[in-house]
């Protein structure tokens, strides 16, 4: 299930979100992380990415990756504490995949969650919709 905000921003109901526009899909103690449709549309044409190193221990809110577009570079933050299990190597040669499929093939990294209690700090889809509406003045 999904929701479209203001006729342009797709939000999936099965994800968690952050105020910094990362989405998180949790399966057991594994979190798959990417940037939202809202974020990729704000960045426009994505041309590069710096991925985190597999095995890296990260804490909630830590900068872990950078997405580069023709317009700007955007830091990607870890939504939870844990260790990086996998990165989407396809993005190194095809970073535009994030623009084409931000919630699917455009995922950025997978994280083994260290503290499942941190999940409660994430936004649900309704809270994320409110966040976007406030920023966009809609």
UniProtKB/Swiss-Prot annotation:
Domain named Lipoyl-binding: residues: 30-112
HAMAP family recorded for this chain?
GcvH
Which cofactor is recorded for it? (R)-lipoate
Gene for this protein?
gcvH1
**Protein name as it appears in the record:** Probable glycine cleavage system H protein 1
Q: What does this protein do?
A: The glycine cleavage system catalyzes the degradation of glycine. The H protein shuttles the methylamine group of glycine from the P protein to the T protein.
Q: What is the lineage of its organism?
A: Archaea, Thermoproteota, Thermoprotei, Sulfolobales, Sulfolobaceae
User: Organism's domain of life?
Assistant: Archaea
Q: How does it assemble?
A: The glycine cleavage system is composed of four proteins: P, T, L and H.
Q: Which family does it belong to?
A: Belongs to the GcvH family.
Q: Which cysteines are joined by disulfide bonds?
A: none
What InterPro entries would the database entry show?
Answer: 2-oxoA_DH_lipoyl-BS, Biotin_lipoyl, GCV_H, GCV_H/Fam206, GCV_H_sub, Single_hybrid_motif
Q: Which keywords accompany this UniProt record?
A: Lipoyl
Q: How is the cofactor bound?
A: Binds 1 lipoyl cofactor covalently.
Its GO biological process annotations read: glycine decarboxylation via glycine cleavage system
**Annotated positions of the N6-lipoyllysine modification:** 71
GO CC terms for this protein?
A: cytoplasm; glycine cleavage complex
**PANTHER family given in the database record:** GLYCINE CLEAVAGE SYSTEM H PROTEIN, GLYCINE CLEAVAGE SYSTEM H PROTEIN-RELATED
